[in-house]
């Protein structure tokens, strides 16, 4: 029962869309209504408001970190086990992708996934973030960096911690993140994906 309750709480935390919340508080249009329609930091940046984009990025990462950290810190006293913690990690990510507060129209999950990985294991999170930075620096594609980082994350976890129940959760998160980037993948293959710093290609 503890596993299910903590997972439900994590899903509700994940369902808070900081792109929507920050935009509303700062008088910006709903992120679903412009650009890619994706409620994430990259789309919020298209308004030209860098502060709003940064706050969105921090908020989305923080909720992923917070849900897992709280469960790991306080959950065992209430009967939460390793399977439950893996459920929490997956649930907060699903909350971001399919938020109950926003008609299940969520973001792609890059920042939230980063927060989750940092909470699971700081070295794992930093290693995955380093992978993103390296790919982004050399190739200048944010989406490609996210895809490569998502592919490597489960392998990093196995190398550091072996195969466990959390491996399965990280693998599912990676698959879902890649699936959320299917339009970006098509644009990359067609040479139409915008590079970091470029204006959005039509």
From Swiss-Prot:
It catalyses: an acyl phosphate + sn-glycerol 3-phosphate = a 1-acyl-sn-glycero-3-phosphate + phosphate. It is a multi-pass membrane protein. GO terms for molecular function: acyl-phosphate glycerol-3-phosphate acyltransferase activity. It is found in: Cell inner membrane. The keyword Lyase does not apply. Pathway: Lipid metabolism; phospholipid metabolism. Its EC number is 2.3.1.275. The chain crosses the membrane at residues 2-22, 80-100, 119-139, 158-178. The keyword Zinc does not apply. One of its GO terms (biological process) is phospholipid biosynthetic process. Pfam families: G3P_acyltransf. Keywords: Cell inner membrane, Cell membrane, Lipid biosynthesis, Lipid metabolism, Membrane, Phospholipid biosynthesis, Phospholipid metabolism, Transferase, Transmembrane, Transmembrane helix. Catalyzes the transfer of an acyl group from acyl-phosphate (acyl-PO(4)) to glycerol-3-phosphate (G3P) to form lysophosphatidic acid (LPA). This enzyme utilizes acyl-phosphate as fatty acyl donor, but not acyl-CoA or acyl-ACP. Belongs to the PlsY family. PANTHER family: GLYCEROL-3-PHOSPHATE ACYLTRANSFERASE-RELATED, INNER MEMBRANE PROTEIN YGIH. Probably interacts with PlsX. This is Glycerol-3-phosphate acyltransferase. It comes from Cupriavidus necator (strain ATCC 17699 / DSM 428 / KCTC 22496 / NCIMB 10442 / H16 / Stanier 337) (Ralstonia eutropha).
């Amino acid at each position: 029962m503890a596993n299910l309750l903590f997972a439900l709480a994590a899903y509700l935390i994940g369902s808070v869309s900081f792109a929507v919340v920050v935009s509303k508080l700062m008088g910006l249009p709903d992120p679903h209504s412009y650009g890619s329609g994706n409620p994430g930091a990259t789309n919020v940046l298209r308004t030209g408001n860098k502060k709003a984009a940064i706050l969105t990025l921090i908020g989305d990462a923080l909720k992923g970190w917070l849900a897992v950290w709280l469960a790991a810190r306080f959950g065992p006293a209430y009967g939460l086990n390793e399977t439950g913690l893996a459920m929490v990690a997956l649930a907060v990510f699903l909350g971001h992708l399919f938020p109950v507060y926003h008609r299940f129209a969520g973001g792609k999950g890059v920042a939230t996934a980063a927060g989750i990985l940092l909470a699971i294991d700081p070295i794992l999170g930093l290693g995955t973030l380093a992978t993103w930075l390296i790919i982004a620096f050399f190739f200048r594609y944010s989406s490609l960096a996210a895809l490569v980082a998502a592919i490597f994350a489960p392998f990093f976890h196995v190398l550091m911690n072996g195969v466990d129940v959390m491996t399965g959760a990280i693998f599912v998160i990676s698959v879902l993140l890649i699936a959320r980037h299917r339009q970006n993948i098509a644009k990359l293959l067609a040479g139409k994906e915008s590079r970091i710093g470029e204006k959005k290609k039509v």
